[in-house]
Amino acid sequence: MYRILLVEDDERIASLLGGHLQKYGYEVKIAEQLNDIKLEFAEMKPDLVLLDINLPFFDGFYWCRQIRTISNAPIIFISARTDELNQVMAIENGGDDYITKPFHLEVVMAKIKSVLRRTYGEYSPSLPQESRIVELGGLTIYPDQNEAEWNSVRILFSQKEFQLLSIFVREHKKIVSRDELLEALWDDVDFVDDNTLTVNVNRLRRKLENAGLTDCISTIRGQGYQFQVNRKDEAEC
């Protein structure tokens, strides 16, 4: 049974959504300590978090960043903020998906199922099965930790970032279309804003660059992305 932490300060919405989730067989905990969501998360160790943005004390973006310091569990934002900027901020702060209020319960359930499948189920990204540690041109990848290492620098990725990296590694030097990535990461292209993919690719690119791995993700105009690691020396790819 998957465990879901529901962080919502509107008691009516929390009760309605929590009850619906339980009918689908999920174990649900509605956060009570809204001043310490990180503690709530650590105590429950949920498989997924549903997180509102407008919260007392600190907003959902803050708590998403706090959770990301201890876990890569998928986080779906649910918010009345419908503008594109907030959706981009949700992804940039570590979120995996975004649902706007008012919402249809069946859409919420479909998104949850999709994220859980891709994170834990049959659609979760797989790197070569012959080894749980993969090396590519000096880049070492640790699938079990959602981490990689370059020049002795460890890089921690969010779930979506690591899914992207997994696909890029599998398709090394090949051009991967945006539609392929959208479908692989979010199951249904129609439900995802195209900017969401751009944000995740940019976050992955930035983390690799911060570790010293530069110019490895190329944007191929009108086609998609190409990932290539060619180790030349200890400083560049």
Curated annotation (Swiss-Prot):
GO CC, any one term: protein-DNA complex
Record feature DNA-binding region, as residue ranges: 131-229
Changes after translation: Phosphorylated by YvcQ.
Alphabetical list of InterPro entries matching this protein: CheY-like_superfamily, OmpR/PhoB-type_DNA-bd, Sig_transdc_resp-reg_C-effctor, Sig_transdc_resp-reg_receiver, WalR-like, WH-like_DNA-bd_sf
Residue ranges of every copy of the Response regulatory domain listed in the record: 3-116
Database matches in Pfam families: Response_reg (PF00072), Trans_reg_C (PF00486)
Domain of life: Bacteria
Protein name: Uncharacterized transcriptional regulatory protein YvcP
Species of origin: Bacillus subtilis (strain 168)
Gene: yvcP
